[in-house]
């Protein structure tokens, strides 16, 4: 970290400490606000200098600003699949921990299930995920690993690679394992991905209800060769009830490859829920997220041969 930036951060922290050190009657919420500011600045610095002094892209800045999100991330229309770095290829054992959840518009607007999700706070959840190499169309090869401008102008970006394959998520495998980890094996009947589009996925519950998820937009950044940040925005509809429920979901994740002391991937992930135009409170929200969930992820490699059967659309 450049000394000048680090010194400025230290001076700011010391000044805040002096300001509040001898104020026993200071308003707790005000002090909490200062703490959040300091933590936010620290996260900005971490994302700026995580693995080297590089220019932060819009997704890195967005994660650092959590939970002060006022709208959707900058995305492009989703075409094809999300391409991951080659170092993510393989099967991984994931430990996911919900560390924070926020309802920015409460008590006026609270999503169904927000309160019940508190039972997952600080509770590690384990499941398998798989990223596999596939042969892509030529257009995908030329477009891989190209982030949004102006971040793409950074000299610290890894160059595009013209390999004979690209790495993508096994969405059916991953979706099934994640759903069963949170809801139980008996609750999930199947997870199917449209063979003509990786952006359309159907999760069928044992009760006969369905969750249809369609990825509509995405973006990605590569600050350094060992970092990867991606976001996807999806339209979701819950079927099987007397009144279908619609919403929009954003998932933004920052991955960091760790090779010492042992191979692993560490990540921070934020899931944001937005109301759809069909919701009665849509204009109250005004495109702001109504629920935010922040997770800490650790991915450890699994030996070859560890797998789990999944259903696919035929």
Model-derived features: positions:
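Elongated, amphipathic alpha-helical interaction scaffolds
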Residues: 13-15
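Bacterial N-terminal signal peptides that target proteins for export
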Residues: 5, 9, 19-41
